[in-house]
Curated annotation (Swiss-Prot):
The record marks 1663 as: Coordinates Mg(2+) for interaction with Complement factor B Bb fragment (CFB). The record marks 747-749, 959-960, 1303-1304, 1320-1321 as: Cleavage. One of its GO terms (molecular function) is receptor ligand activity. This is Complement C3. Complement activation is inhibited by VSIG4. The gene is C3. The modification Phosphoserine is found at residues 40, 297, 303, 671, 968, 1321, 1573. It is found in: Secreted. The lineage of its organism: Eukaryota, Metazoa, Chordata, Craniata, Vertebrata. It comes from Rattus norvegicus (Rat). Disulfide bonds join 558-816, 626-661, 693-720, 694-727, 707-728, 873-1513, 1101-1158, 1358-1489, 1389-1458, 1506-1511, 1518-1590, 1537-1661.
Length: 1663
C-alpha cells in the first residue's frame, strides 16, 4: 500500500468518526405556542434527544431586538424524565408592545448548557375574554339597561384587570365610556345605564376591552324600540327543513300559538308563502290562506301546483338554489293582540343533503389509512343525523352521528400523487341521482430527504365528554431497517391556544401500532389537538423529524356545574305575587348572576342572549390552530396546530405572521322572501329582460294612469316599451271583465252595560319585563361535588312565563351558563289590559281589557269596572262609576273595549277591576300609559361651534355665547329640553408611509477591503438594521435575517480595527496619514452600532479624544490633514466650498452622537462641542450652500441653539418648504434634506415635517450605488428618527366649562385624545342662553339642540311648487292588514312651477296620528320599469308619529305628477291630528310647498262617541260656559275666591287666531278685578289659548267682553310674555255690553257683574 492509499484510509477514518459523532450528537428542541399571549401563563416544552446525563436549560424571553429580558426560567432535563420537561412562562405587558404598530414578536432563547436555540415568536394581546350579559334583549326609551361584564382569563377563570366599557349608538357613536377595575369583584362587574327618553332607535352596542389590549374587543347588542310586550308567541315549523323539488308533496308547516303563560291560543292565522331569490322576495299570491288556530295549533300547506304556477319560468330547475319562506300573522278572536312570525331559508333542493370536508385533513400519508371526517348537513346547515355515507371505489361506509359527522377510513396507494376522493350519501328512498355527492383532493405529506418515514394518528369517532378515555392509535411506517431507532413518540395536547399537556408514548421494538389511552378532563372542552412526532437519524445520516396531528371535538358543556330548578315538593300553580322557591346548584364558592325575564321579551327579540354555546364559539374563534389536523410536512403539522418548533440542528417551523388563521372565502348564502305572481302572458316572453318589462306592465298601481302615460317613464329601449304596452293593455282589458270584492271582517259581540256597585279589589300593578337582577354566592359545603342555595322569592304581578337565567363564575371551574328555568305564572280568572306604547294628549283612543276564564266547566258572570282617573276623559267620571256585566264561557275570553281621552302629559294610570258573581274571585290590573304632547316634536339646532382655543382666540381661552332657542311656536303646557353636546375631534397625525423594508436587502452586504472600503460596505448594513428596527419591518424582511446582519456588522467592526492607528485614528491604510473625516464617520457608525453589537467604548472614545486633541483648532474649527482616497464616500462635503463649516458640523454631530458613551471618559468633550458650536453660530448667517445650512443646522439643533435668527435662515433656505436643494445634485440633496429633517424633529416642528418626509419618499431613494454612502446613511437615519418621534395624533387636552344661569356652579368637561370621540351631553329643561369657555389644546365641536313640541300651523306659503293633497276612504275591495281599523287612500299631486322639470325632488310626509302607510303600495311604486318613485324611507327615531320620505327622480313642469297609496289606521283615535306633505327640491331647499290633510269630520268625530256624560267628559278640559240663569252674585264670589284662583279680569276679545291644534284669543284687559302672578295693567293685551276641541263649547266672538278668571297653574310662559290656558277650571262668562243691557234677561246679570266687581275691588276675597 503506497502513501496515497494511506492518506485515503485516514480520510475514511475521519469520515467514519464524524458520522459516529453525528449519530451521537443530541438534538435539542423547544416547542411553544406560535402565538404567545401577554399576561398569560404559557407552557414551553424542552427536549433533548440522544442526550447523555443531565442537561441544564435556561429559557429567556426577550423583546425582539433583544434589548430587554422580559422573563426567564430554569429547569433540568434528566434521564428519569426522558430528557423531556416544561417551563411556565408569563410575559408581562409593557409599553414595548404598543398595540397600534403592527404585529409584535419576542425572541425566545433556550440555553441547553452551551448550546443555544433561538426563535422569534408572535405575540398576542389577548390575555382573556370579556362576556357581557344584559338583563333583556330589547328596551324602550327611558328604561334602564342592567348588564354584567364577566372578566376571565384564557382558562375562563375570573381575573382582576382594568376594563374599558363603551356604549355606542346604532350609528357607532360612543356616548358613554367607563374605565373600571374587576379587582376584588370576583370577575363580575354589575353595571347599569339609563336610556334617555330622546334616543335613536335601533341596535345599540356595549363594547368592552381590557385596557392593555384595546384592539381585542368584545361586545353585546341590545335593541331600543317603542314596543308593547305581546301576550302570546307564534312558532312556525316546516315538517322538513328543505323542500325537495322533485317530490310530489307540497311544503307542510305547522303553526303553534301559545300564550306566554302556557295556555293555547284560539284565533285566526293568515298565511302566505313565497320564494326568495337573493334579496328579492316573490310572494305567491294564490298561497294566501286563512287558517283557524284551535287549541294553539294549525297547519298550512303550499301545494306544488301553487308554487309552480306562481313563478316564471315554471320549471323545477329554475327554482333550485332559491328558498321558500312562510309568513304568518295570528290574531286573537278578541282582536286584542296580534303576533307576526316568519320562517325563512327553507332551501329548494334536488338533494336533501350537503356534504362538507371542513373537518377532514388536507394531507395523507401514502400507503397508510386516511381518515375522512365527512360532515353532512341538511340544506339549512343543521347537522343531518343517521345518514349513511360511502366513498366511491371503496367499501368504506359509515353513519353520521348526532353532530352530522361520519368517519370513513380510506386505504391510500403507495405513491406520492394527489389523492382524489368522492363521497356520497346512501339514504334509502332517494334515487342515486338525487343523493348528495362531493369530491375532495388530498395532497401527500412531504417527508424529509424524500424518505419513507411516516406517522399517522387515528382516533375513534365517538362523542367525547369529560371522564371518558380516548384511545389514540400511533401508526408507524419507516424506511427499511429504520424502525428500531424509534423508541418513543413525543405527544402534545393543544387546547384554547395553550399547551395543555406533553408526554412520551413508549414504543417497543417491532410495534407498528401503539395505542395511547388519553383521559379526557374538563380542560379539554370544547376541542383539542393532539400533535405527535418522532425523530431519528435517517438512512442518509441526516437528522429527520416526522409528525402528525389530529383535531378532536369534545361535547360542549360547562367545566363546572350550574342548575336552576324549583322545589320538587311544591306542586302548586305559581300565582302572581305569591312566593315560590328557587334551588341553585353549582360549585362551592361560585358567584351566580341571576335575572328573571318575561318570555314576551324573547318573542320580540331572541337574539343576543348569553348562552354557554356562545361562550364556546368565542373561545373556538380564538383558537390558534388553523386546520382539522395533519400538515404538508413536519413543520406544517406543528404550524397548523398552533405550535412553533426549533432545534439546534436547523430544523424549525416557518414564522407565523398573523395571530388569526387565514379566513376561507366566505360562502354567499342566499336569503329568502317575496314578489308578485307571473301570469301566462309573461311566459310568452322568453327573454328575461323583456319578461320583466311585461310583468311590470301588468302590475296594478294606485294612480289612475293610462298605459301610455306609464310608458313615458320607461328608459330601457323600444323593445321593452312594446312588451310593457302589450301586457299593460292586455291586463287592462282583463280587469274590466273580472271585478271581485274580497272583504274580511272580524265580528265582536255586544257587551252588557248594567251598572253595579263594586267592593274594593287590590289591583296587580307591578309588571317588570325583568327582575331578580342579583348575584348570589354558593357558600354551602359541597355534597357529591355540588353546593346548593335555596331562595324564596315573591313573583311579580305579570301572568306570563318567567325565564330564570343564571351565569356563574368560579375560581376553579370558570364560567358556566345554566339552561333557562321556566316559571309559568297564572290564575284561572284574570284581566289582560292591552295598552298602546303611547297616545297623544286630547286624542280619543280605544283600549281593550280582555277577561279570561280558564275554568274547565263553569261559565262566569263578571262585573267589570274602568276606574276614574282625572287625567283621562272616559265613561267613568268623578261622579259616576262605569260598570259592565258580562258572561265568560269556560276556557274562553271576552274583550271589553274602553274609549278614553288622555288630558295630561306623562305616565298615567289606567285601572280595570273585575269581580265574579257568587264567587270570591276577582282581579284588577293597573297599568301605566304614556301620554305625549300634541303637535310635532321638533329638534331645533340652536348652535354649532368649533372649539379650538389654541388657534381661534387670543390668550388660549375661547368664549362662546349661545342664545336661548326661539320657541314661539311651542305647544302650551309642554316642556322643552336643551341638549348641549360636546365631542372632541381626534385629529390623526398622518404619518407618511415607511420605506418598504424589503427594498433594503441590497444594503446588507459583507464588508471587505481597505479601511475606507470596509466602511463603505459596513455603513449601509448598520443603517439598514437601525431602520428596520425602528420601523419594525423585520417581519417583511425576514425575522431570521436580523441575526445574519448583526454578524456582518461584527465582522466589519473587527476588520475596521485592523486599520486603527496607535493614536486611535483611522485611514485607508496604516501607512497613510489619519483622516479626520474617516475617524468621525467611524465614530458615528459605531456609536449607532453600539445598540446592536458589543463595541469597546475605549476604542470608540479613543477616536473621539484624537479628534478633539489633534484636529480641533482654538477657534473650534476641525481641520483635515489626511483626505480620504475614496472621495465618493464623503457626500456633500466633497464640494470644497464652505468646507470648514461642513467638516466642523460633521465632526460636531459625531461628538454629540458619541456623547452618551464617552462623556465620562473624555473630559474635554463638552468644551470641544461648545467651541465648535460657537464657530458654527458665527458663520451660519453667511452660509451660501443649502447643504451646509442643513448640516450645520442639525449640529446647532443638537445643542438646542437653532434659534432665531438662525432658524429663519434655516427654514428660508428650503425650496418649496420641503427640500434643501442644489441643482443637479440628487445625492447631496437627499443627504442635506435628511440632516434638515433631523433638525426639524429635534425642534418638534411637526407641522413642517410632513412635506419634507413626503419629498424624501417621493425621491424613491433606497440607497446603494457609487457615491451613495452618506446619502444612504443619512436618509435612513432621518426616516428612522421620524418614525420614532412623530406622534400618531395631534394633542387633545381641553377643559370646557358650561355656565348655565339656572345653576349655581359651572359644569366642567375634559376632552382627551383617549376618549375624544365620546359624545358628552348636558341636558336642561330651562330654555335659557348660556356661555361656554374652552381652554387647552386640540379641537372639538359644540352642538346645542332644543327638543320641543311645535304647534302645527295650517297655512303655509308655497314657492315654485303647486301641491294638492286629498285623503278619502279606501274602497271595500282594497286589501288591508287584518288588524287595521280602517284604510284610506292618500292622493298627492304636484307640479313644478319652473321652466324645466325639477330633478331630485323629495316628498316629506308626516302621517296622521294612528296611521301608517301601506308598504306594499310603496314597493309597487318604487319597483318595475315604470318606477314612479326612486325610493322611500320611514323614520321613527325621534317621533311619536311616522314620517315617510319619498325620493323622486323628477317633478314635471308641464303636467301634474300624482302618487296614490293606502294608509291604514291601527288604533281608533278620536281627534285625529292632521298630517302634512312637504315637497322640495334637493338642489334648492328654499323651493318648497307644504299642505296639510285630514279626513272630513262628521260632526267633529268626537260626537260619534258621545254617550250619556261622555261628551261632557271628553270636553272636560274645556271650561263650562257660564250663563246668567245659573249663577248668583254670592256663587260668583265664592267661585272667584276658591283656593288656587290667581286672577280675575274683565276682558275684550280683539283677535282670534285658529290653528289645527290650538286656538289663540288675543284679549285686551279692560279691568284688573283681582291681580295675580302676572303684573298686567288695564289696556294691555294678553294671549289666551284653548285646545281646538273646545272651540264649539267656547263660541267666543270678536269684539265681545268677558268676565274671566283662572288658576295660577293655567299661566304659561315667561314674563312678560305670559299666556293663559283656558282649561276646565277657567271661568269665562259673557259680559253684556251697553246695547245688550236693553234686553231684560241681561239686566240682572249686568247688575250682578257690577256688584261682583265692586265687592272684589273694594273688599277682595276673605282669607
Amino acid at each position: 500500500m503506497g502513501p496515497t492509499s494511506g492518506s485515503q484510509l485516514l480520510v475514511l477514518l475521519l469520515l467514519l468518526a464524524s458520522s459516529l459523532l453525528a449519530l451521537g450528537s443530541p438534538m435539542y428542541s423547544i416547542i411553544t405556542p406560535n402565538v404567545l399571549r401577554l399576561e398569560s401563563e404559557e407552557t414551553f416544552i424542552l427536549e433533548a434527544h440522544d442526550a447523555q446525563g443531565d442537561v441544564p436549560v435556561t429559557v429567556t424571553v426577550q423583546d425582539f431586538l433583544k434589548k430587554q429580558v422580559l422573563t426567564s426560567e430554569k429547569t433540568v432535563l434528566t434521564g428519569a424524565t426522558g430528557h423531556l420537561n416544561r417551563v411556565f412562562i408569563k410575559i408581562p405587558a409593557s409599553k414595548e408592545f404598543n398595540a397600534d404598530k403592527g404585529h409584535k414578536y419576542v425572541t425566545v432563547v433556550a440555553n441547553f448548557g452551551a448550546t443555544v436555540v433561538e426563535k422569534a415568536v408572535l405575540v398576542s394581546f389577548q390575555s382573556g375574554y370579556l362576556f357581557i350579559q344584559t338583563d333583556k334583549t330589547i328596551y324602550t326609551p327611558g328604561s334602564t339597561v342592567f348588564y354584567r361584564i364577566f372578566t376571565v382569563d384564557n382558562n375562563l377563570l375570573p381575573v382582576g384587570k382594568t376594563v374599558v366599557i363603551v356604549i355606542e349608538t346604532p350609528d357607532g357613536v360612543p356616548i358613554k365610556r367607563d374605565i373600571l377595575s374587576s379587582h376584588n369583584q370576583y370577575g363580575i362587574l354589575p353595571l347599569s345605564w339609563n336610556i334617555p327618553e330622546l334616543v335613536n332607535m335601533g341596535q345599540w352596542k356595549i363594547r368592552a376591552f381590557y385596557e392593555h389590549a384595546p384592539k381585542q374587543t368584545f361586545s353585546a347588542e341590545f335593541e331600543v324600540k317603542e314596543y308593547v310586550l305581546p301576550s302570546f308567541e307564534v312558532l312556525v315549523e316546516p315538517t322538513e327543513k328543505f323542500y325537495y323539488i322533485h317530490g310530489p308533496k307540497g311544503l307542510e308547516v305547522s303553526i303553534t300559538a301559545r300564550f306566554l303563560y302556557g295556555k293555547n291560543v284560539d284565533g285566526t292565522a293568515f298565511v302566505i308563502f313565497g320564494v326568495q331569490d337573493e334579496d328579492k322576495k316573490i310572494s305567491l299570491a294564490l298561497s294566501l290562506t286563512r287558517v283557524l288556530i284551535e287549541d294553539g295549533s294549525g297547519e298550512a300547506v303550499l301545494s306544488r301546483k301553487v308554487l309552480m304556477d306562481g313563478v316564471r319560468p315554471s320549471s323545477p330547475e329554475a327554482l333550485v338554489g332559491k328558498s321558500l319562506y312562510v309568513s304568518v300573522t295570528v290574531i286573537l278572536h278578541s282582536g286584542s293582540d296580534m303576533v307576526e312570525a316568519e320562517r325563512s331559508g327553507i332551501p329548494i333542493v334536488t338533494s336533501p343533503y350537503q356534504i362538507h370536508f371542513t373537518k377532514t385533513p388536507k394531507f395523507f400519508k401514502p400507503a397508510m389509512p386516511f381518515d375522512l371526517m365527512v360532515f353532512v348537513t341538511n340544506p339549512d346547515g343543521s347537522p343531518a343525523r343517521r345518514v349513511p355515507v360511502v366513498t366511491q371505489g371503496s367499501d368504506a361506509q359509515a353513519l353520521t352521528q348526532d353532530d352530522g359527522v361520519a368517519k370513513l377510513s380510506v386505504n391510500t396507494p403507495n405513491n406520492r400523487q394527489p389523492l382524489t376522493i368522492t363521497v356520497s350519501t346512501k339514504k334509502e328512498g332517494i334515487p342515486d341521482a338525487r343523493q348528495a355527492t362531493r369530491t375532495m383532493q388530498a395532497q401527500p405529506y412531504s417527508t424529509m430527504h424524500n424518505s419513507n418515514n411516516y406517522l399517522h394518528l387515528s382516533v375513534s369517532r365517538v362523542e367525547l365528554k369529560p371522564g371518558d378515555n380516548l384511545n389514540v392509535n400511533f401508526h408507524l411506517r419507516t424506511d427499511a431497517g429504520q424502525e428500531a431507532k424509534i423508541r418513543y413518540y413525543t405527544y402534545l395536547v393543544m387546547n384554547k391556544g395553550k399547551l395543555l399537556k406533553a408526554g412520551r408514548q413508549v414504543r417497543e421494538p417491532g410495534q407498528d401500532l401503539v395505542v395511547l389511552s388519553l383521559p379526557i378532563t374538563p380542560e379539554f372542552i370544547p376541542s383539542f389537538r393532539l400533535v405527535a412526532y418522532y425523530t431519528l437519524i435517517g438512512a442518509n445520516g441526516q437528522r429527520e423529524v416526522v409528525a402528525d396531528s389530529v383535531w378532536v371535538d369534545v361535547k360542549d358543556s360547562c367545566v363546572g356545574t350550574l342548575v336552576v330548578k324549583g322545589d320538587p315538593r311544591d306542586n302548586r300553580q305559581p300565582a302572581p305575587g305569591h312566593q315560590t322557591t328557587l334551588r341553585i346548584e353549582g360549585n362551592q364558592g361560585a358567584r351566580v348572576g341571576l335575572v328573571a325575564v318575561d318570555k314576551g321579551v324573547f318573542v320580540l327579540n331572541k337574539k343576543n342572549k348569553l348562552t354557554q354555546s356562545k361562550i364556546w364559539d368565542v373561545v373556538e374563534k380564538a383558537d390558534i390552530g388553523c386546520t382539522p389536523g395533519s400538515g404538508k410536512n413536519y413543520a406544517g403539522v406543528f404550524m397548523d396546530a398552533g405550535l412553533t418548533f426549533k432545534t439546534n440542528q436547523g430544523l424549525q417551523t416557518d414564522q407565523r405572521e398573523d395571530p388569526e388563521c387565514a379566513k376561507p372565502a366566505a360562502r354567499r348564502r342566499r336569503s329568502v322572501q317575496l314578489m308578485e305572481r307571473r301570469m301566462d302572458k309573461a311566459g310568452q316572453y322568453t327573454d328575461k329582460g323583456l319578461r320583466k318589462c311585461c310583468e311590470d306592465g301588468m302590475r296594478d298601481i294606485p294612480m289612475p294612469y293610462s298605459c301610455q302615460r306609464r310608458a313615458r317613464l320607461i328608459t330601457q329601449g323600444e323593445s321593452c316599451l312594446k312588451a310593457f304596452m302589450d301586457c299593460c293593455n292586455y291586463i287592462t282589458k282583463l280587469r274590466e271583465q273580472h271585478r271581485r270584492d274580497h272583504v274580511l271582517g272580524l265580528a265582536r259581540s255586544d257587551v252588557d252595560e248594567d251598572i253595579i256597585p263594586e267592593e274594593d279589589i287590590i289591583s296587580r300593578s307591578h309588571f317588570p319585563e325583568s327582575w331578580l337582577w342579583t348575584i348570589e354566592e354558593l357558600k354551602e359545603p359541597e355534597k357529591n361535588g355540588i353546593s346548593t342555595k335555596v331562595m324564596n322569592i315573591f313573583l311579580k304581578d305579570s301572568i306570563t312565563t318567567w325565564e330564570i337565567l343564571a351565569v356563574s363564575l368560579s375560581d376553579k371551574k370558570g364560567i358556566c351558563v345554566a339552561d333557562p328555568y321556566e316559571i309559568t305564572v297564572m290564575q284561572d280568572f284574570f284581566i289582560d289590559l292591552r295598552l298602546p306604547y303611547s297616545v297623544v294628549r286630547n286624542e280619543q283612543v280605544e283600549i281593550r281589557a280582555v277577561l279570561f276564564n280558564y275554568r274547565e266547566q263553569e261559565k262566569l258572570k263578571v262585573r267589570v269596572e274602568l276606574l276614574h282617573n282625572p287625567a283621562f276623559c272616559s265613561m267613568a267620571t268623578a261622579k259616576k262609576r262605569y260598570y259592565q256585566t258580562i258572561e265568560i264561557p269556560p276556557k274562553s275570553s271576552v274583550a271589553v273595549p274602553y274609549v278614553i281621552v288622555p288630558l295630561k302629559i306623562g305616565l298615567q294610570e289606567v285601572e280595570v277591576k273585575a269581580a265574579v258573581f257568587n264567587h270570591f274571585i276577582s282581579d284588577g290590573v293597573k297599568k301605566i300609559l304614556k301620554v305625549v304632547p300634541e303637535g310635532m316634536r321638533v329638534n331645533k339646532t340652536v348652535a354649532v361651534r368649533t372649539l379650538d382655543p389654541e388657534h381661534l382666540n387670543q390668550g388660549g381661552v375661547q368664549r362662546e355665547d349661545v342664545n336661548a332657542a326661539d320657541l314661539s311656536d311651542q305647544v302650551p303646557d309642554t316642556d322643552s329640553e336643551t341638549r348641549i353636546l360636546l365631542q372632541g375631534t381626534p385629529v390623526a397625525q398622518m404619518a407618511e408611509d415607511a420605506v418598504d423594508g424589503e427594498r433594503l436587502k441590497h444594503l446588507i452586504v459583507t464588508p471587505s477591503g481597505c479601511g475606507e472600503q470596509n466602511m463603505i460596505g459596513m455603513t449601509p448594513t448598520v443603517i439598514a438594521v437601525h431602520y428596520l428596527d425602528q420601523t419594525e419591518q423585520w417581519e417583511k424582511f425576514g425575522l431570521e435575517k436580523r441575526q445574519e446582519a448583526l454578524e456582518l456588522i461584527k465582522k466589519g467592526y473587527t476588520q475596521q480595527l485592523a486599520f486603527k492607528q496607535p493614536i486611535s485614528a483611522y485611514a485607508a491604510f496604516n501607512n497613510r496619514p489619519p483622516s479626520t473625516w474617516l475617524t468621525a464617520m467611524w465614530s458615528r457608525s459605531f456609536s449607532l452600532a453600539a445598540n446592536l453589537i458589543a463595541i469597546d467604548s475605549q476604542v470608540l472614545c479613543g477616536a473621539v479624544k484624537w479628534l478633539i486633541l489633534e484636529k480641533q483648532k482654538p477657534d473650534g474649527v476641525f481641520q483635515e490633514d489626511g483626505p480620504v482616497i475614496h472621495q465618493e464616500m464623503i457626500g456633500g462635503f466633497r464640494n470644497t466650498k464652505e468646507a470648514d463649516v461642513s467638516l466642523t458640523a460633521f465632526v460636531l454631530i459625531a461628538l454629540q452622537e458619541a456623547r452618551d458613551i464617552c462623556e465620562g471618559q473624555v473630559n474635554s468633550l463638552p468644551g470641544s462641542i461648545n467651541k465648535a458650536g460657537e464657530y458654527l453660530e458665527a458663520s451660519y448667517l453667511n452660509l451660501q450652500r443649502p447643504y451646509t445650512v442643513a448640516i450645520a443646522g442639525y449640529a446647532l439643533a443638537l445643542m438646542n441653539k437653532l434659534e432665531e435668527p438662525y432658524l429663519t435662515k434655516f427654514l428660508n433656505t428650503a425650496k418649496d418648504r420641503n427640500r434643501w436643494e442644489e441643482p443637479g445634485q440628487q445625492l447631496y440633496n437627499v443627504e442635506a434634506t435628511s440632516y434638515a429633517l433631523l433638525a426639524l424633529l429635534l425642534l418638534k416642528d411637526f407641522d413642517s415635517v410632513p412635506p419634507v418626509v413626503r419629498w424624501l419618499n417621493d425621491e424613491r431613494y433606497y440607497g446603494g450605488g457609487y457615491g451613495s454612502t452618506q446619502a444612504t446613511f443619512m436618509v435612513f437615519q432621518a426616516l428612522a428618527q421620524y418614525r420614532a418621534d412623530v406622534p400618531d395624533h395631534k394633542d387633545l387636552n381641553m377643559d370646557v366649562s358650561l355656565h348655565l344661569p339656572s345653576r349655581s356652579s359651572p359644569t366642567v368637561f375634559r376632552l382627551l385624545w383617549e376618549s375624544g370621540s365620546l359624545l358628552r351631553s348636558e341636558e336642561t329643561k330651562q330654555n335659557e342662553g348660556f356661555s361656554l369657555t374652552a381652554k387647552g389644546k386640540g379641537q372639538g365641536t359644540l352642538s346645542v339642540v332644543t327638543v320641543y313640541h311645535a304647534k302645527v300651523k295650517g297655512k303655509t306659503t308655497c314657492k315654485k311648487f303647486d301641491l294638492r293633497v286629498t285623503i278619502k276612504p279606501a274602497p271595500e275591495t282594497a286589501k288591508k292588514p287584518q288588524d287595521a281599523k280602517s284604510s284610506m287612500i292618500l292622493d298627492i299631486c304636484t307640479r313644478y312651477l319652473g321652466d324645466v322639470d325639477a330633478t331630485m325632488s323629495i316628498l316629506d310626509i308626516s302621517m296622521m296620528t294612528g296611521f301608517i302607510p301601506d308598504t306594499n303600495d310603496l314597493e309597487l311604486l318604487s319597483s318595475g320599469v315604470d318606477r314612479y318613485i326612486s325610493k322611500y324611507e320611514m323614520d321613527k327615531a325621534f317621533s311619536n308619529k311616522n314620517t315617510l320620505i319619498i325620493y323622486l327622480e323628477k317633478i314635471s313642469h308641464s303636467e301634474e305628477d300624482c302618487l296614490s297609496f293606502k294608509v291604514h289606521q291601527f288604533f281608533n283615535v278620536g281627534l285625529i291630528q292632521p298630517g302634512s306633505v312637504k315637497v322640495y327640491s334637493y338642489y334648492n331647499l328654499e323651493e318648497s310647498c307644504t299642505r296639510f290633510y285630514h279626513p272630513e269630520k262628521d260632526d267633529g268625530m268626537l260626537s260619534k262617541l258621545c254617550h250619556n256624560e261622555m261628551c261632557r267628559c271628553a270636553e272636560e278640559n274645556c271650561f263650562m260656559h257660564q250663563s246668567q240663569d245659573q249663577v248668583s252674585l254670592n256663587e260668583r264670589l265664592d267661585k272667584a275666591c276658591e283656593p288656587g284662583v290667581d286672577y280675575v279680569y274683565k276682558t275684550k276679545l280683539t283677535t282670534i287666531e285658529l290653528s289645527d291644534d290650538f286656538d289663540e284669543y288675543i284679549m285686551t284687559i279692560e279691568q284688573v278685578i283681582k291681580s295675580g302672578s302676572d303684573e298686567v295693567q288695564a289696556g294691555q293685551e294678553r294671549r289666551f289659548i284653548s285646545h281646538v276641541k273646545c272651540r264649539n263649547a267656547l263660541k267666543l266672538q270678536k269684539g265681545k267682553q268677558y268676565l274671566m278668571w283662572g288658576l295660577s297653574s293655567d299661566l304659561w310662559g315667561e314674563k312678560p310674555n305670559t299666556s293663559y290656558i283656558i282649561g276646565k277650571d277657567t271661568w269665562v262668562e259673557h259680559w253684556p255690553e251697553a246695547e245688550e243691557r236693553q234686553d231684560q234677561k241681561n239686566q240682572k246679570q249686568c247688575e250682578d257683574l257690577g256688584a261682583f266687581t265692586e265687592t272684589m275691588v273694594v273688599f277682595g276675597c276673605p282669607n
